[in-house]
């Protein structure tokens, strides 16, 4: 994460050659990965780099930040982000979550949401805390995006994210409205990727990528 080692020229070439696929820059800010005392500075550097690349290339690169077990508060990280940037793993409970034990949301997190920062649940293997999720949802803080954050080596591995239907079932069990969940796994991600009206919709003329499920009320047994 040493900015002195960033190969910006190579970044430009790769982004230019893959404009249709590269939507942003991602940085992982976890304890043991970045120094405790300067964690937020690394994020500010990446945000500045995204601005510079956008100015030179005419792109609209977002910044996505991995926030699980961050060395600095969730509010400090959220305060660095621009409208449209992504606060990833918003319900992690490993360290410095967005919600305190008394159920209050970090004020800087709320301000970030007001100015358009995107909050992605991105469950993954170790990036979801049930207590943090319950507290945040009870406070009315819903995720903009619900995703799995799956990698090849974690797909179908219980009891974590496993697959998207399992993640959807988690949020149903947590009490979220079904339509709200579906919007967070289809319509909103499509819009953020610049594909609104093409995917994540049943609109006539859209790309047909459809899964049909039966909703069944039953105890989940691993």
What annotation goes with each model-predicted range?
Residues 131-213:
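His/Asp/Glu-enriched, well-ordered alpha-helical/loop segment
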Residues 1-29:
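Divalent-metal coordination cores built from histidine and acidic residues
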Residues 6, 20, 82, 141, ...:
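Structured loop/turn residues at beta-strand edges in well-structured enzyme cores
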Residues 5, 67-70, 192-195:
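Short gly/ser/thr-rich secondary-structure transition/capping motifs
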Residues 217-222:
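Short, Lys/Arg- and Gly-enriched loop/turn segments at beta-strand edges
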Residues 27-157:
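Active-site core of metal-dependent hydrolases
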Residues 1-3, 102-104, 160-163:
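Short, surface-exposed amphipathic charged segments that create phosphate/polyanion-binding patches used
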């Amino acid at each position: 994460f040493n900015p002195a080692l960033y190969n910006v020229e190579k970044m430009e070439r790769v982004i230019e050659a893959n404009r249709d696929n590269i939507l942003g820059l991602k940085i992982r800010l976890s304890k043991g990965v970045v120094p405790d005392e300067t964690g937020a500075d690394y994020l500010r550097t990446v945000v500045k780099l995204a601005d510079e690349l956008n100015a030179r290339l005419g792109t609209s690169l977002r910044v996505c930040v991995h926030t699980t077990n961050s060395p600095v508060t969730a509010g400090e990280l959220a305060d660095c982000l621009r409208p449209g940037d992504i606060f990833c793993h918003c319900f992690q409970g490993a360290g410095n979550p967005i919600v305190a034990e008394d159920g209050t949301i970090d004020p800087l997190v709320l301000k970030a949401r007001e100015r358009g920062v995107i909050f992605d649940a991105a469950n993954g293997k170790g990036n979801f805390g049930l207590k943090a999720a319950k507290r945040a949802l009870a406070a009315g803080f819903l995720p903009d995006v619900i995703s799995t954050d799956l990698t090849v080596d974690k797909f179908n591995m219980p009891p974590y994210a496993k697959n998207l239907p399992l993640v959807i079932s988690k949020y149903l069990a947590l009490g979220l409205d079904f339509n709200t969940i579906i919007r967070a796994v289809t319509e909103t991600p499509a819009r953020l990727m610049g594909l609104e009206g093409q995917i994540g919709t049943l609109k006539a003329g859209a790309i047909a990528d459809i899964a049909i499920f039966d909703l069944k009320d039953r105890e989940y047994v691993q």
